Regions:
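Short, surface-exposed "cap/lid" segments of acyl-processing enzymes
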Residues: 2-56
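Solvent-exposed, acidic/flexible segments
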Residues: 3, 40-47, 76-84, 111, ...
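Short beta-to-alpha linker loops that shape the active-site pocket of alpha/beta-hydrolase fold enzymes
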Residues: 13, 65-69
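Alpha/beta-hydrolase active-site loop
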Residues: 56, 77-98
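Glycine-rich "HGGG/HGxG" loop immediately N-terminal to the catalytic nucleophile
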Residues: 68-76
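Primarily recognizes the serine-hydrolase "nucleophile elbow" in alpha/beta-hydrolase
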Residues: 92-160
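Accessory cap/linker subdomain of secreted extracellular hydrolases
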Residues: 143-198
Length: 198
């Protein structure tokens, strides 16, 4: 009963290259293609079954490309302010596009990076988007303790996310970039370049 709810999904980590934007996979299980440097890519839509389940239950579904995915610049992995703004702006745009009432209930959902984005959207909603009627949030496994996250993934199969974070913060803060670059050897610089297109 009541106004149709809208669920804004924050996507899980897929990669930092533009080919990893959720909009590049569309509302499909995923897509395959080539990166800017010509290597093969797969964009897997991990959350696809959740989108479909929400739609089947009558919710309006919005899947946000986080800032820097599918557009110029580096994707801002674990930049919680930018992730919050991306989801909150997507909620506003989605309601407007659907001609939905401004007070329609909004929920945020995501896991891992998407969990961090969802948690941040809920946290910043009152300040950044007080016009939205945020009714609920699911934030699964958000990477909120960055030092602990770094320790747990360093040397693992998902270590590239460290490069995503460094690339994103380096683009936004010249001081941070200069401090990091002063500590990197050529192998470290190659790692950051590789992360930027993966």
């Amino acid at each position: 009963k009541g106004e149709r709810p809208t669920i804004v999904f924050g996507p899980s980590t897929r990669g930092q290259g533009d080919q990893c934007a959720p909009s590049r996979a569309g509302m499909q299980l995923g897509s395959v293609g080539l990166s800017k440097v010509g290597s093969p890519t797969i964009n897997a839509s991990y959350e696809y079954s959740f989108y479909m389940m929400a739609l089947r239950h009558g919710a309006r579904v919005i899947v946000a490309d986080l800032i820097g995915l599918g557009m110029p610049g580096h994707h801002t992995y674990v930049n919680h302010i930018e992730e919050a703004h991306a989801l909150l702006d997507a909620a506003r745009s989605g309601l407007e596009l659907a001609h939905a009432p401004k007070d329609a209930p909004i929920g945020f959902a995501g896991y891992s990076q998407g969990g961090g984005a969802s948690l941040s959207a809920a946290e910043y909603a009152e300040r950044y988007a007080p016009d939205l009627n945020v009714a609920g949030t699911y934030a699964g496994a958000p990477p909120t303790d960055l030092p602990e996250t770094m320790r747990s993934i360093d040397g693992s199969a998902i270590a590239h996310v460290l490069g995503y974070a460094i690339n994103g913060f380096s683009e936004r803060s010249p001081e941070f970039r200069d401090a990091v670059l002063a500590e990197l050897n050529p192998r470290g610089i190659d790692f950051l370049h590789s992360a930027a297109t993966s």
